Amino acid sequence: MKKIKYYIFFLLGAAMIASCDNELTEDVKMGIRVEQDGVSMQGDVVTVKAGTPVVFNFSGDPDNIMFYSGEPGAVYAHRQRTEVAPEDIESATLHFKIGTQYGKVYENTLEMFVSDQFEGLTKNDFKKDSVLVEQFAWNELVAKSELPDKPSIQKEYTVDVTKYLGKPMTLAIHYQAIDDTKNSMPRYNFSEMYIENVRKDGIVSKFMPSQYGFTAVNMMCNHNLKSQAGMKTNREYGTMTNNTAGIWNLVNAQNGGFYIAGGGKNTGNKNGWLVSDGLITTYCDPDQGTVIKNITQNVESYTHTYNKVGEYKATFIATRVNYKHDSRMMKELTIKVVE
C-alpha cells in the first residue's frame, strides 16, 4: 500500500512539473479591445475624437508590453531610424558657447571653419593631413572678430546650418598660440555644443560633439615640447584626458564640452586642429516606445490620448521571456482621429 502511495505522489509530481514546463514554453497571447462611449472599434480600426482618451483593454498573459502610439517620435517603423530626408527638416542650428581662461594675447589664436567640400582626413598620413587642413579653402563658421578676445569671458553662438542639410558638413577649429615668454597662453572652453534639428512634424533632435567624429591634427607633434612629453602614443592625431598644453581634450564631448589650453609661458608655441567627419546633418533620434507593462505588474488596460486629427498606426509589442522560452507578438491598430 505504501508503495502505491509513493507511486501516486510520483505521478502527481511529474504531472505538475510537466504542467509547469508547458506553461514556461507557451507562446505569448494578447488581445486588445476598446469598449467605451464615444469611441468605436471595428476590427482593427479605432475611431475617436481628438482629445478623447482611448482605453485599450488587454487580455492574455504577456509579461511585457511596449506601446508605440504612431504619433511623431513614437512610430514603430522608425525605432531604428537615425536620419530623415532633408525636406523633412524645418531648420538645423549649431549651438555652442566659448569661455576663456588665462593668457593675454588672443588675437588670431582661434579660428572656426565649415565646409561641405572638404575631402576628409586620411587619419593615417599626417604629412598629407597637416598640409590639407592648412591649405584648404575653408569658409568661416564664426568671424574672427566675433570670437572671444580676452580672458575670463564667455560668448554664446547660434549658427544656422540649414543650407548644409543632406551635404557632408565638416567643422574645423584651429588653435594657434605664440609663446611671447611673458604670459601664459589662452585656454578655450567649448560648452553646450550641439546641432539642433527641428523637423516639420515638430520633433526636435540634438546631435552632440561625441557623434561628430572629431579628430585632432597636432601640428607640433614632432617638436618634442616638454609640455607634451606625457603624450606617449598617437602624437599626430591623439587627444588627452588631462590638461596637456596644446592638445585637445574631448572627455566631455558627449555632453557638448571640450577644450584646449596653451599652457604657461616659456613652454613653446602651440598649434592644433580639431576636424570633424563629414556630418550628415539630417540626424534624428530613433523613435521611442512606452513601456506599459513589465513582469512585475498586472496591467489590464492602458489609456492614451490623441490630440491631433489624423490617422495613426498604434503598435503593441508583447513578450514572454524565461529561461526555457522567448516568445514575442505584435498587434497593430489603425487609429482614426476625427474632429
Label each PLM-derived region with a short phrase.
Residues V48-A50, F56-G60, F67-S69, Y302, ...:
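Residue-level signature of extracellular beta-strand-rich folds
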